[in-house]
Amino acid sequence: MTKTEFLEYVKKNNIDLKKYNFVIGEKSNTPYTVGCYEEGEKWYLYEVGERQNFSIVKSGDEKEIFNYLYFTLRGNINM
């Protein structure tokens, strides 16, 4: 899944990413956040813990990162 496909899925299903503490395309230090950002041609998936500890969970290409985000988001919502 690409970033565009992920965002289309979110829009189609009226999902508020902020409600689930998801951040796309930038770093955040908000506790309990899951997000991703791109540096160069590499994508990074991160989590922010209770005490604002920023941890990179995974790095890879766009499809790999957005597939992970998609399944994480699906696990957090009841559709």
Regions flagged by a language model, labelled:
Residues 1, 14, 54-60:
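Short, exposed beta-strand "edge-strand" segments with a Pro/Gly-rich flavor and a Y/T-containing core
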Residues 1-28:
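Negatively charged, low-complexity tracts enriched in Asp/Glu with abundant Ser/Thr
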Residues 4, 60-75:
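A short, charged, amphipathic alpha-helix used as a generic interaction element across diverse proteins
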Residues 6, 16, 36-38, 44, ...:
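Structured catalytic/translocation cores of nucleotide/phosphate-coupled proteins
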Residues 11, 16, 55, 68-79:
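Short arginine-rich
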Residues 18, 23, 27, 32-34, ...:
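General N-terminal targeting signals
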Residues 27-54, 72:
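Short aromatic-glycine-(Arg/Gly/Cys) micro-motifs in beta-strand/loop hairpins
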